[in-house]
């Protein structure tokens, strides 16, 4: 998910007015509405990142994980993104790398920065004030509040990208079967 504005609706899905109408109708029908919040990252088109990437000394300069290159110009660690490739992307304006656990278009927020935490709490309050009943928190396992120096992951010559490990398959089968039990049309 690429979040460009944490307090707006993706225009593909309508407007805030449309959302308010949906929310009111759902509540009139006795339904509760939950929305996704992605606290770990945002879009590289979000105003927070657009400002942060401009320089090392603006008000949001440390809202993301920015790290100088190694002496040879390479990425600061050997970390890989979940979607393949390096977890670091070079930003020529800052002459630094930024961390992204997923896509380069999804830079990780820096939870070591209290202003980031406050901004995310403000986002939650914004949606609660609109009447949202709850949230599904996405990608929380990738929240990173550590600070440099970052360390390389140890080499793992046996690592293979592939299907779900055998020992995890029974649990996910059980999860799938439970969902089908309650919703047989799935």
Summary of predicted features, one role per range:
Residues 4-125, 129, 141-186:
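Acidic/aromatic-lined carbohydrate-recognition and catalytic surfaces
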Residues 135-137:
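Hydrophobic residues within beta-strands of alpha/beta enzymes
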């Amino acid at each position: 998910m690429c979040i460009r504005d944490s307090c707006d609706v993706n225009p593909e899905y309508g407007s805030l007015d449309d959302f308010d109408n949906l929310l009111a109708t759902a509540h009139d029908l006795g339904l509760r509405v939950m929305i996704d919040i992605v606290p770990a990252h945002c879009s590289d088109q979000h105003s927070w990142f657009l400002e942060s990437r401009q320089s090392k000394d603006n008000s949001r300069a440390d809202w993301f994980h920015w790290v100088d290159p190694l002496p040879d110009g390479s990425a600061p660690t050997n970390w890989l993104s979940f979607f393949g490739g390096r977890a670091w992307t070079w930003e020529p304006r800052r002459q630094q790398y930024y961390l992204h656990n997923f896509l380069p278009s999804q830079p990780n927020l820096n939870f070591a920065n209290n202003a980031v935490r406050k901004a995310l709490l403000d986002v939650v309050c914004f949606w609660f004030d609109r009447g949202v009943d709850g949230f599904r928190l996405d990608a929380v396992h990738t929240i990173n509040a550590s600070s440099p120096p970052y360390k390389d992951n140890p080499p793992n010559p046996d690592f293979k990208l592939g299907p779900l490990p055998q020992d995890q398959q029974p649990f996910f089968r059980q999860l799938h079967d439970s969902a089908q039990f309650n919703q047989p049309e799935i």
